[in-house]
From Swiss-Prot:
Upper taxonomic lineage: Eukaryota, Sar, Alveolata, Apicomplexa, Aconoidasida
Listed transmembrane segments: none
Protein's recorded name: V-type proton ATPase subunit B
InterPro entries per record: ATP-synt_VA_C, ATPase_a/bsu_AS, ATPase_F1/V1/A1_a/bsu_N, ATPase_F1/V1/A1_a/bsu_nucl-bd, ATPase_V1-cplx_bsu, P-loop_NTPase, V-ATPase_su_B/beta
Species, as recorded: Plasmodium falciparum
Pfam family, one: ATP-synt_VA_C
Biological process (GO), any one: vacuolar acidification
A GO MF term: ATP binding
Subunit: V-ATPase is a heteromultimeric enzyme composed of a peripheral catalytic V1 complex (main components: subunits A, B, C, D, E, and F) attached to an integral membrane V0 proton pore complex (main component: the proteolipid protein).
Purpose: Non-catalytic subunit of the peripheral V1 complex of vacuolar ATPase. V-ATPase is responsible for acidifying a variety of intracellular compartments in eukaryotic cells.
Alphabetized PROSITE patterns for the sequence: ATPASE_ALPHA_BETA
């Protein structure tokens, strides 16, 4: 009897393992040898019976290899297929197309945490295949706006300029605007290492098990991919991170899949496993370039700078998958990273991204050239949902007032610095001298911190008060009198 049970368990395990890796689409399948043309990443087939939009197909090549594709456009009996692994080697004589009859789905399991996948969702860490608990459509299910919960409760990143002045709340989508040569990878990795829930009164679950990071990389080089993977492993954070890596030498079209697969994983962990998921997507500029390549191959009418006219709505299908839902404790917070071509914030990619997302964090080249890390310029940075996640019972009662005062003083100090270059330091007033002192200490003490330095929100606020004490009380007009009387003295009570 015991032997029969063992055999049954072994058989069940084998069947489950096969189910995780097999092509689970409908059977029998139709096969077509009617490839009429190959253009860039696209393959055109003719005489197809009832082709369906977004249907997944398998292309069999003459060397017995297979490639996956997706029907991108249907016109009568003609279908245009977008091939994920590239079209080199596909011909119209020996290659044929097998139609599945289903859309692209991703096997999901909480075992995906701690694993590394390629841009198509296949394991590349030499580990076993995922035993799926469920198969989910990578395009996700639209969230009823009526069922959305307003984002609140702050996520602590350990970086003072973000936590104090551009606070990120659970369920928010806020991008990092960077440029070529700036340390956005280091900032992204640091946030991945340090991100956690603020230990406030309203946080029900303080354990790290309730927090996960999904990292999707698009078009990164081998060095960057190795850096992220090695950083997570060395700092013991890998077990709470799920990595999807599309390298620069991987097919360009795969970059269109990568963010959707990453977000599908995040939705499963957030809404099925009720975890708080922090999603980092880098680099969204590579995604937009892949979108432009497909649009060009389809000979569509180009929009600004050659990007397709529908790029705004396409980006929204990615960014709008962040948020919280009624009846679920989990949340998805998005932190996409994009590099602005030629440092141009008016470029279509950052321009359209800024319309959709709830603020932005700006990485500044001038600060970086002065060896300030992280080189985050707080003046063009903004978090539109910051007010709902800070203050009494969430961080500290003085948080919003300190943030406003820091912004005000830093902006005035920049004006004084520009005026000093014109009229000289001798012509400045005593108040102007205080602002210049504040500017110097703000950049050296508040903005600057070590790559592995994790400041909690209370440490960052205390540093901010040290800087504000440069000024007499009557110059701190953004802070209420009762807050000043409590926190302005050097030995204040928390």
């Amino acid at each position: 009897m015991s032997k029969e049970v063992v055999n049954t368990k072994a058989e069940a395990s084998r069947v489950n393992a096969l189910a995780a890796v097999r092509n689970y689409k409908v059977c029998p399948r139709l096969e077509y040898k009617t490839i009429s043309g190959v253009q860039g990443p696209l393959v055109i087939i003719e005489d197809v019976k009832f082709p369906k939009y977004s249907e997944i197909v398998t292309i069999h090549l003459s060397d017995n290899t297979t490639r996956q594709g997706q029907i991108l456009e249907v016109c009568g009996k003609k279908a245009v297929i977008q091939v994920f692994e590239g079209t080199s080697g596909i011909d119209n004589k020996n290659s044929y197309v097998e139609v599945s009859g289903d859309i692209l789905k991703m096997p999901m399991s909480d075992e995906m945490l701690g694993r590394v996948f390629n841009g198509s969702g296949k394991p590349i860490d030499k580990g076993p295949n995922i035993l799926a608990d469920d198969y989910l459509d990578i395009n996700g299910n639209p969230i009823n706006p009526q069922c959305r919960v307003y984002p609140k409760e702050m996520i602590q990143t350990g970086i003072s300029t973000i936590d104090v002045m551009n606070s990120i709340v659970r369920g928010q989508k806020i991008p990092l605007f960077s440029a070529a040569g700036l340390p956005h990878n280091e900032i992204g990795a640091q946030i991945c290492r340090q991100a956690s829930l603020v230990q406030g009164k309203d946080v029900l679950d303080h354990s790290d098990d309730n927090f996960a990071v999904v990292f999707g990389a698009m078009g990164v080089n081998m060095e960057t991919a190795r850096y992220f993977r090695q950083d997570f492993e060395e700092n013991g954070k890998m077990e709470r991170v799920c990595l999807f890596l599309n390298l620069a030498n991987d097919p360009t079209i795969e970059r269109i899949l990568t963010p959707r697969i990453a977000l599908t994983t995040a939705e499963y962990l957030a809404f099925e496993k009720e975890m708080h998921v922090f999603v980092i997507l880098t680099d969204m500029s590579s995604y937009a370039d892949a979108l432009r390549e497909v649009s060009s191959a389809r000979e569509e009418v180009p929009g600004r700078r050659g990007y397709p006219g529908y790029m705004y709505s396409d980006l929204s299908t990615i960014y709008e998958r962040a948020g919280r839902v009624e009846g679920r404790n989990g949340s998805i917070t998005q932190f996409p990273i994009l590099t602005m071509p030629n440092d141009d914030i008016t470029h279509p990619i950052p321009d359209l991204t800024g319309y959709i997302t709830e603020g932005q964090i700006f990485v500044d080249r001038n600060l970086y050239n002065r060896q300030i890390y992280p080189p985050i310029n707080v003046l063009p940075s903004l978090s539109r949902l910051m007010k709902s996640g800070i203050g009494h019972n969430m961080t500290r009662i003085d948080h919003p007032y300190v943030s406003d005062q820091l912004y005000s003083n830093y902006a005035i100090a920049q004006d004084v610095k520009a005026m000093k270059a014109v009229i000289g330091e001798e012509a400045l007033s005593n108040d102007d001298i205080l602002y210049l002192e504040f500017l110097d200490k703000f950049e050296k003490r508040f903005i600057t911190q070590n790559t592995y330095e994790c400041r909690d929100i209370y440490q960052s606020l205390d540093i901010a008060w040290e800087l504000l004490r440069i000024f007499p009380e009557d110059m701190l007009k953004k802070i209420k009198t009762d807050i000043l009387s409590k926190y302005y003295p050097r030995h204040h009570a928390n």
